[in-house]
A protein has these predicted regions:
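Alpha-helix capping/helix-boundary segments
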Residues: 9, 49, 82, 100-101, ...
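Short amphipathic alpha-helical segments and helix-helix/interface helices
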Residues: 29-34, 65-66, 102
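Short, electropositive alpha-helical surface patch
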Residues: 55-70
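Acidic, PIN/NYN-like endoribonuclease modules and their adjacent C-terminal/linker elements
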Residues: 2, 11, 17-26, 91-92, ...
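PIN/NYN-family metal-dependent endoribonuclease catalytic core
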Residues: 4-57, 74, 138-142
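Short beta-strand scaffold positions
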Residues: 77, 96-99, 115
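A generic structural signal for well-ordered alpha-helical segments
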Residues: 36, 68-69, 127
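Acidic catalytic patch
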Residues: 47-52, 69-91
Length: 146
């Protein structure tokens, strides 16, 4: 099973845990990452994730995300197919980087694309993603725990 976590999902465990939703999503992401580390789930990395990682001005968050992405056993290169699909997603109102993440997941044939971003979740569920299911961290942990 291949899973693509966007950067907000990867970073969720570092967010303030004062909100119940954030704390629950953080635990869900950590559970999925443990499955990736054990080889039960394949984490998909991408050029888009590396680009976003490099832009992060917070050293702790940047280092944490780099460690997470070092465990990616699959990788989506931003090629012509990814760029074309991302442009199609942008036409639906997705932000360019969000569209690039989703396109990377779809072209890498990830089973799941996971985001904590409610706006992206709604927009991504409205487009054709083939075999890639768009899920929240809580939905993802329920799926991978089966």
């Amino acid at each position: 099973m291949k899973v693509y976590l966007d950067m907000c999902s990867i970073q969720r465990p570092l967010d303030s845990q004062d909100d119940v939703r954030v704390a629950t999503e953080a635990q869900a992401v950590l559970g999925v990452l443990r499955l990736c580390e054990s080889g039960q789930v394949t984490l998909v990395g991408s050029d888009a994730l590396l680009f976003e990682l490099e832009k992060n001005p917070h050293p702790i968050r940047k280092d944490y995300a780099a460690v997470v992405l070092s465990n990616a056993a699959a990788f989506a290169v931003t090629d012509q197919r990814v760029e074309t699909r991302a442009r199609q997603f942008e036409l639906t109102g997705m932000k360019p980087l969000d569209a690039l993440h989703l396109a990377s997941a779809v072209e890498a044939e990830a089973d799941f694309f996971c985001t904590c971003d409610d706006r992206l979740l709604k927009r991504a569920r409205a487009v054709e993603t083939g075999r890639t299911r768009v899920v929240s961290p809580l939905e993802l942990v329920a799926e991978v725990s089966r």
